[in-house]
Amino acid sequence: MSIKIGILGYGNLGKGVECAIRQNEDMELAAVFTRRDPATVKILTEGAAVCRVEDVEAWKDKIDVMILCGGSATDLPEQTPKYAKLFNVIDSFDTHARIPEHFGNVDAAAKEGGNVGIISVGWDPGMFSLNRLYANAILPDGKDYTFWGKGVSQGHSDAIRRVEGVKDGKQYTIPVEAALEAVRNGENPELTTRGSRCCKG
């Protein structure tokens, strides 16, 4: 018997989740839910339905786990509690400062529906956090550093695009080279997460 999975949101994350499901024989993609016209969404999995988000409640007893693939800025704070009342849910909410608030909202909704809500299990927080935990367990007297970039931040870019009047936007994260070198040289500097920001039109 396979675990029936629903995907809500079919952008880069949703497509990646579909590929992961296809690699696990005990999982089956039941449906993808989208805000777009379902006729325009082409998925890889034969036999899986593509439905409008508005139709999700009709799948309440047909899906074991709903994986929410929206953005942390505005999608997941609303979607995860809403759908935790109907399904077991998983999200990758990554606004670190708001995780306790998000947990409280999802926990209450999941309990109301008799479901399980698992939040913030993307990369960071998520798999990357576990890697850091393992390293700290093995080297308890060590000092760990986290550098992001060089690269595009999907979450920050999503937040930028949701600002009224912004047609498109990308946020690039570039670590401070002097900080990288200090760590590489074994200087164990005290660093903060504050960085400089610039905008280019």
Please identify what each model-predicted range represents.
Residues 1-5:
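Extreme N-terminal starter segment of soluble prokaryotic enzymes
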Residues 8, 16, 136-201:
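Active-site-lining helix/loop region of Rossmann-like oxidoreductase modules
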Residues 13:
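Hydrophobic/small residue at the entry helix of a nucleotide-binding pocket
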Residues 23-45:
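NAD(P)-binding Rossmann-fold cofactor-contacting core
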Residues 56-61, 65, 73-92:
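Rossmann-fold NAD(P) dinucleotide-binding segment
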Residues 91-92, 117-121, 147, 170-171:
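General beta-strand structural signal in soluble alpha/beta enzymes
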Residues 93-117:
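Rossmann-fold NAD(P)-binding glycine/threonine-rich loop
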